[in-house]
């Protein structure tokens, strides 16, 4: 299983790719076999990049404010898993595939650490508004890079704006925001 398949189930990814193809007036496909179509390969690549880009901002559905990361008992190393998009706060970073503590200058830990973690969620586990935003933004970039149809661009830009607004509404409803100290994302920025 490759990395992109881990976050898009084949049926969900096929649906998303077909939405992208439909946006540019192409016929749907029945398989994600990239050998048969450059359009499918390009659509998948853009879709997965946009998915990571949007999720990496950190949202109520993919921020874990008290994730416990446990080191390997023999090496003391904590792997920085592919699903980890970032650790907020600035103290811990990904260095060579391992969690690295910048304040102590080491990647070896004697015990578990608790962090605020942004993780890449499976497509099917995301709120609908985020799925729509990802597919619409990916469709727009797909059109822009490979076809350049201006009328399609304008239509997709409007749809993307509406999808993003729906995501912002979702975030206001489900995020834990307050005037005094903000959310986990704001705390991460403050800690930099």
UniProtKB/Swiss-Prot annotation:
This is Tail tubular protein A. Pfam families: Tube. Coiled coil: none annotated. Keywords: Degradation of host capsule during virus entry, Degradation of host cell envelope components during virus entry, Glycosidase, Host-virus interaction, Hydrolase, Viral attachment to host adhesion receptor, Viral attachment to host cell, Virion, Virus entry into host cell. Structural component of the tail, which functions as a receptor binding protein (RBP) and mediates the attachment to the host capsular exopolysaccharides. Displays a depolymerase activity that specifically degrades the polysaccharides of Klebsiella pneumoniae capsule, which allows the phage to reach the host cell membrane and bind the entry receptor. Hydrolyzes maltose. Does not hydrolyze alpha-lactose, beta-lactose, trehalose, melibiose, cellobiose. Displays amylase activity. Optimum pH is 5.5-6.0. It comes from Klebsiella phage KP32 (Bacteriophage KP32). Belongs to the tail tubular protein gp11 family. The keyword Hydrolase applies. Homotetramer. GO terms for cellular component: virion component.
